[in-house]
Amino acid sequence: ASPAVVFTCATNKTEAACQTQAAIDASFAAWLLTTTATGGCNGSLTTSPTTPMAPNACGGSTTVTWTYTSSCAPLTTTCSATFTVTASPAVVFTCATNKTEAACQTQAAIDASFAAWLLTTTASGGCNGALTTSPTTPMAPDKCGGSTTVTWTYTSSCAPTTTTCSATFTVTASPAVVFTCATDKTEAACQTQAAIDASFATWLTTTTATGGCNGSLTT
């Protein structure tokens, strides 16, 4: 009697996403070899597809059917198994919203608000994700007014490979300076000193200034 056919089929296997493709390929190649067949007469073990390919490292599956043929019964023995790579985590991208701060705060306060605002853009998921900004080192606007637009880019080795967004941080313009200067004034002599003093005091107050930030009028 011909040797009995001994057919050992691979079992379904699952690998995690975000490994290198080389690691997935190596695991898949080793998995293929776990299907073995011996016995019968002139036995031949083939696969369908003829040249099985590993799934993508970002997720997918490959089902392989092995067929062992023998010129002695059983003439054909088959089995199938599936090698799966789990799907990569979905990219979750939360972008900062435009923000406006009032002028005339301290620069330290503006810088702190800007730094906190930068952190409101977050990204996770995909594979080997990296979040970068343009400009590389964003700087807060001047406390007296201005704006900074930042573009964030999240890259992943699995789709979506690039996700971007932009937002603007603005400091309102400081109020315009309005400066009204006293005009030359002449008083007649021979008034009382009290009258001159009163007129002088009134004249001093005709110079006024408003606007800017933390303005101070001195003489």
Regions found by a protein language model. Give the residues of each.
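Proline-threonine-serine-rich low-complexity tracts
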Residues: A1-T219
